Structures are given as structure tokens and as C-alpha cells.
Amino acid sequence: MFLTQTFIYTLTPKFDILISGGGSYARAEYTNFFTNEYSSKNRIGFDSLWLGFIDTGDSIADLIPQITFQTAVVQREKAINQTKNFYLKSQSLQASLRGYSDPVVYSIYTGFGYNQSRKFKTLKIEYGNSIYVGGDLSIILSPKITLDLGAEQRFQMKQKINGYQNSEVRSIPTLSLGSTYSINSDTAVSVNASFGGSSASPDSIFGISLWKKF
């Protein structure tokens, strides 16, 4: 289970500061090979903190361009029995175009994710970079409710451990379906489910988001 908190602070009408932090809860279950005794272990911890910006350009033929950049200030990762913090090791850059045609709000986007290698005591892990392209569609059903649809195609580059390749380039298609309900002009809640289209992606991810304007 994951929990992510995102803050968007508007400096100017076309420039926003983006801050995002996340943590997770995981439960590991074990069965003793010799005694067949069951045991479990719970973990709650901080995972990452990202900092970036959103730059909105002037409209082009009724489409609004945006550039979003983020860098991982800190990421907490575990390999075998070592947990280590990594600083400024991952960055992402995304370009998008947003448009509106009653009753639909839509966007298309493409992006690139960059990962530097991670060095542990006995391991050097190179996760590989990623590129992706996708689109989102929100159908306005009423003044308070939208139906949200999305599709994305991502390619994850080869991964290496201690210089040895242990994965090929992976194609990761996903589809998403959800809905957003506006409680008032400052607050909205949304539910979302995404479904993977390959063995390299999770079968399904379900999420609930709360949006609040201060």
C-alpha cells in the first residue's frame, strides 16, 4: 500500500512549484522450511521526496502546452539486507498538450525518465531509463462528476546488476479508468484503477485521491 502527498504552489499564473513525497506499508509473510511455522513482518517507511516545476505556455491552436520537470531529492531503497538513501539519482521530464471540447477535457503527453546507478555495499544496480507516451480523457457527466480514462505505453530500458544484464527492454502498456467528484470549488475526490497489459506491469492498481486547494 502506498501513500503519496503532492503540493502544487503557484508562483505565477503560468509557473508552479511541485513537491511530492511518498511512503509505503508492506507485509511480508514467511513459512519456516523445517517447522512449517508461520510468521510475518510489517514495514512502514518513507520512500521518496521529489521536487520540480510545471511551466505552462501560451495556447497553440486551442491547445495548452505544459512542461513538467521533477528530480528525486532523496530515495530510500533496499537491496538484500542493506537500506540506503540516494540523493538526486532520478529525474523525469514530461511535455503535454491539453485541450477542451465540450464536454471533454483531454491531454496527450510524452516523457523521459532518467536513472543513475545505485551503489550498495556489494551491488551496483543500473535500473535503466524509460520513455513513454500516453493520453488522458475526462468526460464531464455533470457539473460535479467526471469520467476519467487514460492509456499509456512505456518502454523500460535494460537493467544491469554488477555489470551483468538481467532484463531486456520491457514494453509496459497500461489502461486506467476512474471518476472525480467535486465536493466544492476547493475540494475534490477521485477513485482510479489502472490495469497492466504485460507481465512487466502490475495486474491492477487501485487508488483514492483527495484534492484540496488552499
Predicted regions and their residues:
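Transmembrane beta-barrel strands of outer-membrane/channel proteins
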Residues: 19-23, 67-75, 108-114, 135, ...
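Outer membrane beta-barrel transmembrane domains
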Residues: 30-32, 127-132, 136-214
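Outer-membrane pore/translocation modules
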Residues: 22-126, 168
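Subset of outer-membrane beta-barrel
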Residues: 1-49, 137-140, 146, 194
